[in-house]
Amino acid sequence: MPEQPLPTLPMWRVDHIEPSPTMLALRANGPIHNVRFPRGHEGWWVTGYDEAKAVLSDAAFRPAGMPPAAFTPDCVILGSPGWLVSHEGGEHARLRTIVAPAFSDRRVKLLAQQVEAIAAQLFETLAAQPQPADLRRHLSFPLPAMVISALMGVLYEDHAFFAGLSDEVMTHQHESGPRSASRLAWEELRAYIRGKMRDKRQDPGDNLLTDLLAAVDRGEATEEEAIGLAAGMLVAGHESTVAQIEFGLLAMLRHPQQRERLVGNPSLVDKAVEEILRMYPPGAGWDGIMRYPRTDVTIAGVHIPAESKVLVGLPATSFDPRHFEDPEIFDIGRDAKPHLAFSYGPHYCIGMALARLELKVVFGSIFQRFPALRLAVAPEELKLRKEIITGGFEEFPVLW
C-alpha cells in the first residue's frame, strides 16, 4: 500500500476566517501531527490545547526567533538587537522587564480615554466618506498606529508614516538582500525611533520611549537594544491588531444573531472580544508559533527529533473539545475559559492588555455608531493578505 502524503501547510481558512475543514479533521485525530511546511520541510503541528501550553512553556524548545542553522531564514528582524523573540532565558527576561511597565494595567487604563477618543474620531472620518468606504484605510489600519503613538509618546501625525514602515517590514520580511524592501523599511523605522529618543532627552514624559531611555541610562540596555525594543513593540502591536479588528468585524457580520445580542446588551463586549480572539484570531493558513526542540522529545506519545520544526497551532487549539465545550459554535455569551490567542509561557504577548482595550472600544461602539454596517462586496471578494502571517485584508469596503 503506497505511503500517504503528509498533510501540507498552509491550510487556508474557509471564507477567510472559518477554520479549515482539513485542520479540524486532523485535530480530531490527535493533538500532534506530522506535516509538510510550505518550503518542503517536514515537521510537526501541535493542535491540542494542553500540548501547546506544554511546548510553549518548556525551555527544552528554542523560541521562534532562534532557529537552528538549517532553518534560519533571511529575515531582517530575526537577530536584530532588542527583538524579543530572538532572545531567551535571562536575556529575554531582562529585555522584557524593561518594556513591561508600558503595558501594565495602570498604563493601559490611563490610555483608555485616549483610545475611545481615537476610535470616535476615526468613526467620524469613516462616516464622512462617500459610500462604499474602505474601513481598513479609515479605521482598522490607523487606530492601532494612533494608539501606539500615544503609548510611545510620539505625535499622532506620525502614525501613518511608521504604520507604513511596519507594514513594509512584515509584508516583505522574507525577501533577501541588503536592499530588500523589508530591510530598508526596518532601517528607516529604527532611524525614526532613534531620532524620537533623542527628542525625549529634552522632553520626557510617561511613555515607552522615556522608559527605554531610563533603562539605557541605568545600564540595563544598550541604545541599540532600546531602539529594537521600541521598533518591535510598534511592529508587533500594529499588524496583529489591524487583522484582529477586520476578522472580528467579519465574524460579527457573518453571525447577525450574535451581533444583535451585542447591540442589545453592550455589557457582553468583554465576552464578545474573548470569543472573537478564540475563534477568529489573526492569521491566514499557517497560523501559529514555531519552536525547535534542542534534544529529542516526546509529545503526547509522539517522538520528535532534535531541531525539528514544531509549529504550535494557536488557532487550532481553540477547537480542542477537551478544553472548550462545542468549540465550533461562535457564542459571545460563552463562559470564558483561557485561550491561546496571545500565546503562553515566557513569550506570551506583552501587549495583550492594550490589544484587548482596543478591541473592546471598537466592538463596544461601532454598531451603535453604524447600526446598518455591512460589507459592500460578497465576503469571498475580499482579498486576504496571504503574504503576511497575521492575515487581514487588502481592503475592507463597507456600507452603512
UniProtKB/Swiss-Prot annotation:
Annotated residues for binding of heme: C349
InterPro entries per record: Cyt_P450 (IPR001128), Cyt_P450_B (IPR002397), Cyt_P450_CS (IPR017972), Cyt_P450_sf (IPR036396)
Superkingdom, natural source: Bacteria
Alphabetic keyword roster: Heme, Iron, Metal-binding, Monooxygenase, Oxidoreductase, Plasmid
Named cofactor requirement(s): heme
Broad enzyme group: oxidoreductase
A molecular function (GO) term: heme binding
Enzyme Commission code: 1.14.14.-
Protein family membership: Belongs to the cytochrome P450 family.
The protein's role, per its UniProt record: Cytochromes P450 are a group of heme-thiolate monooxygenases. They oxidize a variety of structurally unrelated compounds, including steroids, fatty acids, and xenobiotics.
PANTHER family with a match to the protein in the record: CYTOCHROME P450 BJ-1, P450, PUTATIVE (EUROFUNG)-RELATED
Protein name: Cytochrome P450 BJ-1 homolog
Organism: Sinorhizobium fredii (strain NBRC 101917 / NGR234)
